[in-house]
Amino acid sequence: MHRQHILVVEDSDEDFETVLDAARRGGVSRPIVRAASGGECLRQLRATPRHREALPALVLMDLNTPGEDGRDALREIRNDTILQPLPLVVLSASANPRDLLFCYTHGANAYHVKPVEHALHLQVLQQIFAYWLASVVLPA
């Protein structure tokens, strides 16, 4: 059983707490690591040993973070041959069709709009975790 972590790129403390709550409620036992920006995400990934077992099982990415944002991180991850296979799910407040097109064009595996209502936000996160961590087969 893999104990790979989940990397959550989220600048909002409240939204990060919602991620942790959804993981607890969904029985997610993997460690959850936070990066507050796309730039911090890239620094963490580049500092990680370059083998599959050390990389995250899932990257959950907010687009609009300070400094280097989620768009920058998405581009860099998909241009790196070691990081490229990482499952990357965007969870953003933006429903702008340009953001969706950008993310899918640059290799996001999925795009979810963050619900405003807390209960729905929890539900979406639990569905993401169930699908990406329990249902699909990920690269080894």
Language model regions located:
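Conserved acidic segment of CheY-like receiver
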Residues: 3-24, 59
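Conserved active-site segment of CheY-like receiver
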Residues: 10-11, 91-95, 115
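Alpha4 helix (beta4-alpha4-beta5 surface) of REC/receiver domains from two-component response regulators
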Residues: 17, 21, 71-72, 95-110, ...
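Residue-level signal for the "D+5" position in two-component response regulator receiver
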Residues: 34, 65-68, 97
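Acidic, metal-coordinating helix/loop segments flanking the phosphotransfer/catalytic sites
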Residues: 34-58
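C-terminal output helix
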Residues: 40, 116-129, 136-137
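Active-site residues of response regulator receiver
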Residues: 61-62, 92
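Short amphipathic alpha-helix used as the core "switch/output" element in two-component signaling
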Residues: 71-84
